[in-house]
Design a protein with these regions (language model features):
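Gly/Ser-rich "nucleophile elbow"/oxyanion-hole loop immediately N-terminal to the catalytic nucleophile
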Residues: 43-75
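Short glycine-enriched nucleophile-adjacent loop
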Residues: 78-89, 95
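Short alpha-helix in the alpha/beta-hydrolase fold that links the catalytic acid
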Residues: 127-145
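Short, proline-enriched alpha-helix->beta-strand connector loops that line the catalytic pocket
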Residues: 30-31, 110-116
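Active-site machinery of serine-nucleophile hydrolases
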Residues: 1-52
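C-terminal catalytic histidine-bearing segment of alpha/beta-hydrolase fold enzymes
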Residues: 119, 125, 144-202
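Active-site nucleophile loop of the alpha/beta-hydrolase fold
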Residues: 40, 96-104, 123
Length: 202
């Protein structure tokens, strides 16, 4: 789910999300995947429910492995998707939360073993990295409340907060928009794709 700049603002904005790397990156992996990218009309309950309905539509009408359905959200899209996976954690095996704040609940994620990868620049200009740490702490606490060990939590929850040097060495100096670089990292994408609803947490 893309951010504000690729939301739906009328016909002139149609398809602006299709060149977004957060969409294209998944199609360039060796594994066959169905990739769906929606354009938000807001980042509140309307788009949350639309995201869930879109997921359900593809599950019901296409050849989808229901144990391997994933979500990704960047910026405003992350605000929406964190709510969507919290509302329907039974649908998703893993979620990539990029450069965003967490607007959903934590407990439903832990109760349904949804794996979450959180990526935020240390000096993100819009949200600040404290938002990412807060989300990580909330999810970690929810998994501990469930009785999981640190090792088990490590299988399900990762926080990555790169410093300025990480971005500057890649000629990136706007750290919020630079958060899109997470979609260039096949290690992260493959971590998401490695998760399954049928996977036993060791």
């Amino acid at each position: 789910m893309p951010g504000y700049g690729m939301m739906w603002f009328g016909e002139d904005s149609s398809g602006s999300n299709l060149e977004w790397n957060g969409f294209r990156a998944w199609t360039e992996l060796p594994e066959d995947v169905i990739v769906v990218s929606a354009q938000l009309t807001d980042w509140h309950e309307t788009s949350v429910r639309q995201a869930i309905e879109l997921t359900e539509y593809f599950i019901e009408n296409f050849s989808v492995d229901k144990s391997r359905v994933y979500a990704a959200g960047y910026s405003a899209g992350g605000e929406t998707m964190s709510q969507a996976i919290s509302m329907r954690p039974d649908l998703y095996a893993a979620y990539l939360h990029g450069a965003s704040q967490w607007d959903g609940a934590y407990e439903p994620i832990a109760q349904n073993d949804v794996a979450v990868y959180i990526f935020m620049a240390e000096n993100d200009e819009y949200y600040g990295s404290a938002k990412a740490r807060s989300a990580y702490d909330g999810l970690q606490a929810a998994y501990r409340e469930k009785g999981y060990t640190d090792k088990q939590i490590g299988e399900l929850l990762i926080l990555e907060i790169p410093n300025n040097e990480y971005f500057n060495s890649r000629d990136i100096y706007n750290y919020h928009s630079g958060g899109n670089i997470v979609f260039d990292d096949e290690t992260v994408l493959n971590w998401i794709l490695s998760k399954s609803k049928t996977q036993e947490i060791q």
